[in-house]
Amino acid sequence: MTNKLSPAVPPKFQPINTILKTGKSSQLRYIRLGKLLITGFFIIIASLFFLYPQIFYCELIRFSGFHSENNKIYFSPQIQPKSFGRINRTIQKAEFRVDSFFVGQQSRPVIIVCSNPQEYQKYCNSTEGAGCSLGTPWGNSYVVLNEQGMNVDVISHEMSHTELLARFGWWTVATKTPQWFNEGIALMLDRRFVNNPDEIGRYFDYMDEWLYYTGGGQQILELRDIGSIKGFFNASQKQVMLAYMSSGLEVSYWLILSEGRGLEQLMQAMQEGKSFEEAYRQAEEKQRKIMFKKLPTNPLRFQDSKKISD
């Protein structure tokens, strides 16, 4: 009996035109996907420009008609060059104040100096005030100033906001840090309302301001009600001033309890994963019971006062 070997089965080859069609269809899919991604990107950019046009104007400031010698400070073309030196000196004084309070300045915001309400509206998206600050998730920050009302207090106030952005990060400031704390820290550099270099004296002065705006403590604004930007600013002018004074009162009190290292301890604790509330309490814990007997009670903390005295 003889064994007959079966002939080997030849491999199946696809016709060359089938391969070309398959490759072409894959390319078409990638092209369509690329077009969708590009279209989606431009839609997102257009939406962000519609919602936050001031960010885009600030990002493109170097392509505007504003003058700058160092890409750090941009002057409106309407500002005379002879004024540059005076404005630069005012900005430097504000930077020294920030550097002193934070024990070193980490932020390097681009500063835009406007000469009229139209320019200020364009770069700040507001017609109120003499200055504003803007921060981006990608790390850029801007301080927009109105030449007519800018001074060391205004500039250092806004630079305080950009300093917190540099130290804590945009996401932490935007989502985890209450607005009253952000504004309260800024008031420690802004001397338009209280000008007292002594920590305890500053707390007493903010207490006086707070008593004035609350009608002797009759119209208290709780800190939890001014934790968001909307809660802080979406109110009457009198209520906004009360929000500022409440923030100044609380933060000046906290800085006494945290013995000058509060910001550093707060930042470190939050980097370790603690919530703002937990880190804030932890920074003052050591001195809270000691100073409770030495300082007038903070009216924004009556519940805490009861717990300590019990």
Residue ranges with predicted function:
Residues F84, N88-E95, D99, S156-H157, ...:
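Extracytoplasmic/secreted envelope proteins and their assembly/folding machinery
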Residues A8-F13, G169-W171, F232:
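Short, flexible active-site loops
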Residues M1-S68, T297-D310:
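N-terminal low-structure segments adjacent to metalloprotease catalytic domains
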Residues F42-I55, I111-E119, N140-L145, R202-W210, ...:
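Short, mixed-charge, low-aromatic patches
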Residues P11-Q14, P81-G85, R89, Q118, ...:
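Generic alpha-helical secondary structure signal
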Residues S26-I44, Q92-G104, Q121-P137, N182-E199, ...:
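Charged, low-complexity, helix/coiled-coil-prone segments
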Residues V173-S247, I256-D310:
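Acidic/His/Gly-enriched intrinsically disordered linker/tail segments
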Residues C58-V173, P178, F276:
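Juxtacatalytic substrate-recognition/specificity segment
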